[in-house]
């Protein structure tokens, strides 16, 4: 998959996954995702 930096595009893709890659600074959840197995 590819990373999108356009806010409106986040809705088009998977909100959960796209957000995690596009907004790593959004919340601590991003850190958890990196350590958690898919």
UniProtKB/Swiss-Prot annotation:
The keyword Secreted applies. PROSITE patterns: ALPHA_2_MACROGLOBULIN. Hemolymph. GO terms for cellular component: extracellular region. InterPro entries: MacrogloblnA2_CS (IPR019742). It is found in: Secreted. Its main location: secreted. Keywords: Bait region, Disulfide bond, Protease inhibitor, Secreted, Serine protease inhibitor, Thioester bond. The keyword Nucleotide-binding does not apply. Signal peptide: none annotated. GO terms for molecular function: serine-type endopeptidase inhibitor activity. There is a cross-link at residues 27-30 (Isoglutamyl cysteine thioester (Cys-Gln)). Homodimer; disulfide-linked. Is able to inhibit all four classes of proteinases by a unique 'trapping' mechanism. This protein has a peptide stretch, called the 'bait region' which contains specific cleavage sites for different proteinases. When a proteinase cleaves the bait region, a conformational change is induced in the protein which traps the proteinase. The entrapped enzyme remains active against low molecular weight substrates (activity against high molecular weight substrates is greatly reduced). Belongs to the protease inhibitor I39 (alpha-2-macroglobulin) family. This is Alpha-2-macroglobulin homolog.
């Amino acid at each position: 998959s590819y990373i999108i930096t356009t806010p409106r595009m986040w809705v088009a893709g998977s909100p959960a996954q796209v957000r995690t890659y596009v907004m790593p600074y959004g919340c601590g959840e991003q850190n958890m995702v990196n350590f958690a197995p898919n």
